[in-house]
């Protein structure tokens, strides 16, 4: 990382930082997932959900300004979901996304989590899954998955050690799947051969 940064908990009373996170969400997802947070009001709903009790919500600050945000929630058993993750597009490539993910992985493991689930969608023809009827052969489509645009986050997740574990057809609309990845963050178990 080229700039000094800090990662801190985002709380419900951090209004200035919440406003910065909302602006970051709207601007960052405009191309990759335009229907998800199209307005500041929609972004505020996402942030409010991530600030509920039992959730982890962390901001990465560069020069005192929000440069990224990550959240995680307990799903059930030892499974947690990382959602969302956003880094200012002008600051990508500096290791900030990795730093946020590693911070959340540490917190989840500390809370007893073993597996961390992350999802990424394809709503804009950036992978070979877009526009396909994935109900026909979802596992075959995953096996043959290709990334057409290096800006799609799938490669980022794989570089951080996340494994493809599934696909949810039409999750974001017809032909717009959710790609599911997971990583073991807790202690490794002993498995049968």
Language model features: what each stretch is:
Residues 108-149:
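Conserved GNAT acetyl-CoA-binding A-motif
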Residues 22, 26, 30-61, 71:
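Active-site rim helix/loop that mediates acceptor-substrate recognition in acyltransferases
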């Amino acid at each position: 990382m080229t700039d000094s940064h800090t990662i801190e908990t985002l709380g419900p009373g951090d209004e200035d930082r919440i406003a910065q996170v909302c602006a970051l969400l709207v601007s960052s997802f405009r191309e990759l997932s335009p229907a998800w947070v199209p307005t500041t009001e929609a972004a505020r709903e996402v942030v409010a959900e991530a600030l509920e009790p039992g959730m982890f919500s962390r901001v990465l600050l560069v020069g005192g300004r929000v440069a990224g945000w990550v959240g995680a929630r307990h799903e059930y058993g030892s499974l947690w979901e990382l959602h969302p993750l956003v880094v200012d597009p002008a600051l990508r490539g500096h290791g900030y996304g990795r730093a946020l993910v590693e911070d959340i992985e540490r917190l989840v493991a500390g809370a007893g989590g073993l597996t961390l689930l992350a999802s990424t969608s394809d709503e804009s023809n950036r992978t070979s899954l877009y526009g396909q009827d994935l109900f026909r052969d979802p596992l075959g489509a995953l096996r043959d998955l290709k990334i057409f645009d290096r800006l799609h986050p799938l490669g980022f997740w794989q570089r951080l050690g996340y494994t493809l574990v599934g696909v949810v057809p039409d999750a974001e609309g017809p032909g717009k799947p959710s790609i599911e990845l997971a990583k073991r963050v807790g202690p490794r178990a002993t498995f049968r051969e």
